[in-house]
Amino acid sequence: METLSQDSLLECQICFNYYSPRRRPKLLDCKHTCCSVCLQQMRASQKDLRCPWCRGVTKLPPGYSVSELPDDPDVVAVIAIPHASENTPVFIKLPSNGCYMWPLPVSKERALLPGDIGCRLLPGNQQKPVTVVTMPMEQQPLHGNIPQDIIEEEHERRGVVKSSTWSGVCTVILVACVLVFLLGIVLHNMSCISKRFTVISCG
């Protein structure tokens, strides 16, 4: 039951898409949360933003956009990269298609979501674009402190997921072959029936 509420916290309850940098969780005046894309669509069709659940009105001053509404801090706290210290390791994508880790200070006012584009000043006042990337557990730098049995369990779990995916693909292919075979039988029978009628009408 807890996973259902956790999933519903991570997705917009209007379009059921997960929150992302493009679909930021925006907090309405009534304290309900929707993604910024749904709110922009509502804003395009009506003057004020009306909450689809409680019908409460969130007024935006003229010239203000939906992006200026505050992010829901509870949702951002769940989907943002967890930070134990002030610096969080992120990958910086370089023009040469190489990446390296760099500690990026996390802003207290606006946490970065995975996939967000930020900017980091490098020596010599050069600016480089920074993309926040979530890292799988086994690729994190403190991998040496994790007991070996936990690592093996994680690899086994991933193997089960891969094998279940492969068995799903095989099932789909098998069902498709059976359907094609049955369709061939039906078409063959139809051609035999039409030939019988031709023989009867001619003879």
Swiss-Prot record:
Q: Which residue windows are transmembrane per the record?
A: 167-187
**Which key words tag this protein in UniProt?**
Lysosome, Membrane, Metal-binding, Transferase, Transmembrane, Transmembrane helix, Ubl conjugation pathway, Zinc, Zinc-finger
Q: Which InterPro entries match?
A: RING_RNF152, RNF152_C, Znf_RING, Znf_RING/FYVE/PHD
Its principal location? membrane
The record, for Gene3D superfamilies, names: Zinc/RING finger domain, C3HC4 (zinc finger)
The record gives the membrane topology as: Single-pass membrane protein
Q: Which reaction does it catalyse?
A: S-ubiquitinyl-[E2 ubiquitin-conjugating enzyme]-L-cysteine + [acceptor protein]-L-lysine = [E2 ubiquitin-conjugating enzyme]-L-cysteine + N(6)-ubiquitinyl-[acceptor protein]-L-lysine
- Reported function: E3 ubiquitin-protein ligase that acts as a negative regulator of mTORC1 signaling by mediating ubiquitination of RagA/RRAGA and RHEB. Catalyzes 'Lys-63'-linked polyubiquitination of RagA/RRAGA in response to amino acid starvation, thereby regulating mTORC1 signaling. Also mediates monoubiquitination of RHEB, promoting its association with the TSC-TBC complex and subsequent inhibition. Also mediates 'Lys-48'-linked polyubiquitination of target proteins and their subsequent targeting to the proteasome for degradation.
This chain's protein is named E3 ubiquitin-protein ligase rnf152-B
Taxonomic source organism: Xenopus laevis (African clawed frog)
